[in-house]
Curated annotation (Swiss-Prot):
It catalyses: D-glyceraldehyde 3-phosphate + pyruvate + H(+) = 1-deoxy-D-xylulose 5-phosphate + CO2. Keywords: Isoprene biosynthesis, Magnesium, Metal-binding, Thiamine biosynthesis, Thiamine pyrophosphate, Transferase. Thiamine diphosphate binds at residues 63, 104-106, 137-138, 165, 272, 353. Mg(2+) binds at residues 136, 165. It comes from Wolinella succinogenes (strain ATCC 29543 / DSM 1740 / CCUG 13145 / JCM 31913 / LMG 7466 / NCTC 11488 / FDC 602W). The gene is dxs. Binds 1 Mg(2+) ion per subunit. This is 1-deoxy-D-xylulose-5-phosphate synthase.
Length: 619
């Protein structure tokens, strides 16, 4: 939709229709709502002043970019938002040329803009300029300031729209958020600042010194001091819902041909009164009734996250040494109740995964029992800290890895399929996984008192595949596997975490063909060498199930063990392929990639038949 030349009234009508479309689709499909509604006028302003087919439009996280999608030829397709093979909930270049870069994790936008600006400068292009939209929540991460530090020195022309709604996902945390929220009306100060700068240019040296001191004192009460000290131009705060003011400011910033930060104050959930209230509830939502705001499906009260939360709360009440941290996801990781109950022992440190891990390393050194509750996809942001600050000193930090496996509608930037591979590489790391809710309780208890080094346990977003009561649960024993079913054929199913449930369901489907054995590894590091050796004498063909990538995964660990001890077994991975997994409902995605029970059963059957055929050829 071309917004150039449209009147202010027409642009306001466009904004209204965009909000209506977003509400219509998100109430049906689910998605990121409040941040999206709050950014509508800012995005309309961007499209009215800049050209997304030419200027790199870079959205931090990009969950707030729905209006951008609607303005760039995806109005009808938007009905498929976050559905399998439909419109992504984030910017995606393969979906549209107007989506400059893929996003999903926070605080990358300014670095991308600096890189784009360098390319524009090297190409000697005069008519292109990066435009960034970043929320105040993302400004709590250090990557932003690494980029701003270089930008202030290099002075690449760009416009950075800082969307300040005094909210990230949860309650804003830290000095940066407090600094932004204290911003005062900026026009008066912009006017005074301009007059002071003109005065400085005409005063003799002695008087100029006094005027310069006056300017420095003025900065103490203006909201832009932080950015100006970094060498950037600052405009604001402006009303992020006033299109006239937004467009005028964007035009001024564009004409300055410098790095300019526009500080816009907005209201999350703008235009939908119900969503203008509670902070976290309306960030990411499932389908809901538009008139009442009530979810169409009640959330499960016994999700793995809830089980983890309740178990850790019980342990924290019993043991004052139990502490914990989350990075801007207290509700999503289940730490909200603990932050509320024990505010001096559980912390939300904002979008700062590196800081979260390193700070817990120090607590572990001081004799505390720190839990880092974090999504699998976000833990990778702190990989160096896990190695350097936790691993080398063998500190007993406990990593509770939520969303392990396929997470669904958020797509490739959020799938939790790499953690087994990247954690298994770390010396002295213990890596385990529960198979059920009851097993998860035991995992949390085991991790609490584990003292040999760092320990991690992973669990899925949705319910475990394995139903409760199928197998009796017992406490975890360090490095010990558990034999669950004995088979009469030479086929053994090896499960890890949620893979145990998948293996069990496949065994039922194939019961008429094979009577298989089933073992729950429980630990992929260290492996239970004794039990594995015993199993190698009973079963020739091992099929390995886990909810993670096969590269560096559980089967890889078993193949390393096989090579080390010389076990005469065939190890076949039923894990996820070495690919990024697209968005869609978990059930649809699993069916498409052959990771549901039907697909896995067929894969097992084909692999075993291939082995049988090859043996016949050798006879």
């Amino acid at each position: 939709m071309n917004l150039k030349g449209k009147t202010l009234k027409e642009l306001e009508e466009v904004s209204l229709s965009i909000r209506e479309r977003i509400l219509e689709v998100v109430s049906h499909n689910g998605g990121h709502l409040s941040s999206t509604l709050g950014a509508v006028e800012l995005i309309v302003g961007m499209h009215a002043v800049f050209d997304s087919s030419r200027d790199p439009f870079i959205f931090d996280v990009s969950h707030q970019a729905y209006a951008h999608k609607l303005l760039t030829g995806r109005w009808e397709e938007f009905a498929t938002l976050r559905q399998f093979e439909g419109v992504s909930g984030f910017t995606k270049p393969s979906e549209s040329e107007h989506d400059y870069f893929i996003a999903g994790h926070s605080s990358t936008s300014i670095s991308l803009a600096v890189g784009a600006a360098k390319a524009i400068s090297l190409s000697l292009e005069k008519n292109r300029m990066p435009v960034v939209l970043i929320g105040d929540g993302s400004m709590s991460a250090g990557l932003c300031y690494e980029a701003l530090n270089e930008l202030g020195d290099r002075k690449y022309p760009m416009v950075i729209l800082l969307n300040d709604n005094e909210m990230s996902i949860a309650e804003p945390i830290g000095a940066i958020s407090k600094y932004l929220s204290q911003a005062i009306a900026g026009r008066f100060f912009q006017s005074i600042k301009g007059k002071v700068e003109k005065l400085l240019a005409h005063l003799p040296e002695g008087a100029s010194y006094m005027a310069k001191r006056f300017e420095e004192s003025l900065k103490l009460i203006t909201p832009g001091i932080l950015f100006e000290e970094l060498g950037l131009e600052y405009i604001g705060p402006i009303d992020g819902h006033n299109l006239k003011e937004i467009i005028e400011t964007l035009r001024i910033a564009k004409a300055m041909n410098k790095p300019v930060i526009i500080h816009a104050q907005t209201l999350k959930g703008k235009g939908y009164k119900i969503a203008e209230g509670p902070r976290e509830h309306w960030h990411g939502v499932g389908p809901f009734d538009l008139s009442s705001g009530e979810p169409l499906k009640k959330p499960c009260s016994s999700s793995p996250t809830d089980i983890f939360s309740r178990t850790l709360l019980e342990l924290a009440k019993e043991d004052e040494k139990v502490v914990g941290v989350t990075a801007a996801m207290p509700s999503g990781t289940g730490l909200s109740a603990l932050v509320h109950e024990f505010p001096n022992r559980f912390w939300d440190v904002a979008i700062a995964e590196q800081h979260a891990v390193t700070s817990m390393a120090a607590l572990a050194k001081e004799g505390y029992k720190p839990f880092v509750a974090i999504y699998s996809t976000f833990l990778q942001r702190a990989y160096d800290q896990i190695i350097h600050d936790v691993g080398i000193m063998k500190l007993p930090v406990k990593f509770a890895i939520d969303r392990g496996g396929i997470v669904g509608e958020d797509g490739e930037t959020h799938q939790g399929i790499l953690d087994i591979g990247y954690l298994r590489l770390i010396p002295h790391m213990t890596l385990m996984a529960p198979r059920s809710n009851e097993s998860l309780k035991e995992a949390v208890k085991f991790a609490k008192d584990f003292s040999l080094g760092p320990i991690a346990f992973r669990y899925p977003r949705k319910s475990f595949v394995l139903q409760e009561g199928i197998f009796s649960e017992s406490p975890f024993l360090y490095g010990k596997a558990e034999r669950l079913m004995e088979g009469k054929d030479e086929v053994l199913f090896v499960g890890f975490g949620n893979g145990v449930g998948r293996a069990y369901e496949v065994s039922k489907v194939m019961a008429s063909e094979y009577e298989v054995g089933l073992v729950d590894l429980r630990f992929v590091k260290p492996l239970d060498h004794e039990t594995l050796w015993e199993l190698s004498k009973e079963y020739r063909y091992w099929l390995v199930f886990s909810d993670a990538s096969k590269v560096g995964g559980v089967a890889s660990a078993l193949l390393e063990w096989k090579a080390e001890v010389g076990a005469e077994v065939e190890i076949l991975s039923m894990e996820l392929e070495d690919e990024y997994i697209q968005h869609g409902k978990v059930e649809q995605v699993e069916e498409e990639i052959g990771f549901d029970v039907k697909g896995l059963s067929q894969k097992v059957r084909e692999r075993l038949e291939r082995i049988a055929n090859s043996q016949r050829l050798l006879v």
